[in-house]
Each structure stands twice: as C-alpha cells, then as structure tokens.
Amino acid sequence: MLKEQPKGTVTVLLGAQWGDEGKGKIVDYLIAKDKVQVVARCQGGNNAGHTVVANGRKYDFHIIPSGIIAEKCFNIIGNGTVVNLDSFFEELDHNKITNIPGWEKRILISDRAHLICDIHMLVDGHSEDRLNINKIGTTKKGIGPTYSSKCFRNGLRVGDLVYDFDGFTLKFRELVKYYQKQYPDLEIDVDLELIKFKKHANKLNELALVADTVITLDELRSSGKTVLVEGANGTMLDIDFGTYPFVTSSNATVGGAITGLGLPPMSIKRVIGVTKAYSTRVGSGPFPTELKNDIGDKLQRIGHEVGVTTGRKRRCGWIDLVLLKRAHLINGFTDIALTKLDVLDTFDVIKAGVAYRLDKELLKSPPSQASDWEKVEVEYRTFKGWNTPILAMRSFNELPENCRIFIEFIEQYVGVPVKWIGVGEEREALILREP
C-alpha cells in the first residue's frame, strides 16, 4: 500500500469574538518561539487590522501576513482573500518592509485572489449610505462588493491583471458599466484606473509576487515546513455564523482556512482561538454584554480600544462566554489565547456573561434573528478583582489568586485550556501556561 509522505503541520489561529482580539501578538509570539516557518492569510482584505509590537517598534498590518517581519518566514496571501493593491504597496512602505533585504522572496499573492477596485469602494459607500439607520457598520473598503463580484462571477482576479492585461482591461470596463447601471451617479476615471493597474501589474511581475499558492503551500509543507494560518476578523463576524447581517463578507471560521488556501482538512492539527479578557466591537451590531456606562468607558480608555483599520472607538463590555463557547463549537479550538488581561487590573468587580434569556426563556444557542438580539438578557457570573499589576508576571502561579480563578472559570465553562495569557502590549508580556 502506498504511504503518503509526512508533511508540515498546519495551525489555524482565529479570532473568537468580533475581531481586534490581539491575534497579531500571538502570531508574532508563535513565529518567534514556536518555529513557525510559513504564515498565510486565507480570507478578508484590508478591512482587518493586526498590530504587532516587535523589534522595538509597532507594525500595523491589514492584508500582509504578520510573518513578513520575521526573516525566516515565508508569507502567503491566499485565494480566499480580496486584495487592494494600493493598500498592499502602501502597507509595505508604511511598515518599512521594503528595507528588509530579500523581503520580496518571502511573500506571494495567489493568482486566484480577487482584486478590490476603486469602483468596489464607491459602491460600498453608496450601499451603506442607502441603509440610513440600518447601517451594517462597513469599513467602506470595498470588501463586500468585491466578494459580491466574485459570487456574481464578474470579479477581477490577480491572475487576470498579471497574466493578461488586455483581457483585464476589457473585464474592468465591463465591471464599471455593470455598477454604473445600478448607481448612475457613480463617477470613476476608467483610463486613470487602468494606468494605475498597469503600474501594479508591472511591479508584481518585476518582483515575481504572484503564483498559484496552492502549489507553493504544498511544496513548503512537503519540505517539512510548519504553517500558521492567520485568520482575520473574528468568529462572530463570520458571514454564516456571525451576528448576521452585521458581519463581514467571508468565512472567518476554520472552514475559511481550508477553502481560502486550498488546504486539506486533515492537515490542520491545532486551532487556536484568541479572545480578550473582555469584549469589544467596532461599528454596529448586536453586543449583549456591552457596557454603555463608566465601566465601558474605563475599559475603552485603559485598553486603548481604537480600531486599527477604522480609527473608530471600540464598544466595550464584559467577556461573553456564551459566544466564546459557541466559537469553540464551530471551530473546535484546541487552545485559547486570552489577551489583554492586564486591562482588568484595577477593576474591583469583573463579570462574565454565562447565559442568554429571550422572553425569560433560557436559550440553548445564540439567536439567528437580528431582531431577537435586541431583546436578549444576559446572566452573569461575578468575580472579585485582583487590583494588582500583572505586567511583569511570567508564570501562571505568579498571578493573583482572583486572577487565576477567573481564568480557570473561563476554560472550565468553554471546555478548552487557556494556554497563552497576555499581560501587556510587548511580545514578551505573555504567559505560556504549561499543561
């Protein structure tokens, strides 16, 4: 019988809330300490925002995988993503990635990834404005319309741009006509856009940044390299499992890693769920444990809760264990990374949402209807605070007793071990909890 040769394993790291959980910090730690050799993005676009503090400086990533700052790491932007090339090149410059020797040999964009065009961003803004009071809270980055083009099969892919620019030109003009029929007041200089895209095509070809990344990923795994899939957004923003319609336009759950990179399901050996020790959300949508009071303001202030992508203040509330357990049910977390625990250092009382009631009835699962979310009542478990700075602590046993009780309750409720505990902003401000 033919035996398949062993290949490098895959770890998928996902947001367990509404994004902004601190995934970038955990990715950076895993690259530095866990010998991760490949980092891949599988879905979303530059609507995501990962902040990494390393090498004495802060990096803000939106579409580029966080592994680009580690010289040993290869980076892939997969077929499931949507790519704004203006933002891609701006992000390289902003983070001074082009100053790193050989950076271009360590990153590839899938030729099957779809392109975000200016027309998509214009449509995104028009669609959101038409909703009036029922706004989704889109970042207006063109993400939704680009995925819509993909599904409608009139989208433009990176391969169209770099392999056949004449064909790309025809498709682009048709796409603009299609949208202008729906939105007659849309104004766009097609010729100017095509000049810009031609420059991008030349640069991508010159640097050899585009390929069939399914093959690349398989070759890397066949050589024994370990892969970390860097999920964007969060489980509760998933197009299927999130708080629909207040969601993103892609699958931000573990299935998105498989379809967004062309990975075999059995290649995934570990799924890490990242959650803050409290909850935050940017923009509109259900948020059962939100604190619209001084406590919420305090969380926002101490946690510096401002969106990396939007610059908007994040709404803040207590950790929602009902949704965290739901995220585990969908993704099958093997480990949890609990971030920003230090933000709770000065709170006398800390709470965790442990049950939902709708019309006084205990719910077995979160509501599927948007209207029901507004009526959900949350039951809480209350904990005593620890009122002790934990920034310098590097082992679980060093943490104050009340802090340990809080963490242990989370893992018992969800049924997943808390392996990493973030106690500060720097890479080193992280506790690895051994079994």
UniProtKB/Swiss-Prot annotation:
- Coiled coil stretches, renumbered: none
CDD domains given for it? AdSS (cd03108)
Free-text cofactor note = Binds 1 Mg(2+) ion per subunit.
Q: Name one GO cellular component term.
A: cytoplasm
Q: Which UniProt keywords apply?
A: Cytoplasm, GTP-binding, Ligase, Magnesium, Metal-binding, Nucleotide-binding, Purine biosynthesis
Kindly list the GO molecular function terms attached to this UniProt entry: adenylosuccinate synthase activity; GTP binding; magnesium ion binding
UniProt protein name: Adenylosuccinate synthetase
Q: Which organism is it from?
A: Brugia malayi
